[in-house]
Amino acid sequence: MRVEFAQSIIDSFDKKPNLVFITGDLGYMALEKVQQKFGERFINAGVAEQNMVTVAAAMAYEGFTPFVYSISPFVTLRPYEQIRNDVCLHNLPVKLVGNGGGYGYGILGATHHNLEDIGAMRILPKMKVY
């Protein structure tokens, strides 16, 4: 899934120069082509999920459309307050992409499992879940 996702990002970014990609220290073995092709439009925010979402909100406020990508609990639950306050309450076009959403994330343990992501996101104002 990650390789196909990376290719769809490349296809979209080729057509829309206002798109940016922000990841929470993920992407090895899948996103290297995105990083190589789009350089300054690819941001590795590191293990700083709240900051990653706030940076995305600021970029959206300035006219960009950020895609924020991480393992599901780190793009939904960990930065939940920033999603609510910085993204939803301002109705900003930030796209949150959670890898492994809606189910357990294998052997990585309970911190990487996220069975409640869809429910948590659906109750936020102006949030759309696909």
Which residue ranges define each predicted feature?
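Thiamine diphosphate
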Residues: 1-130
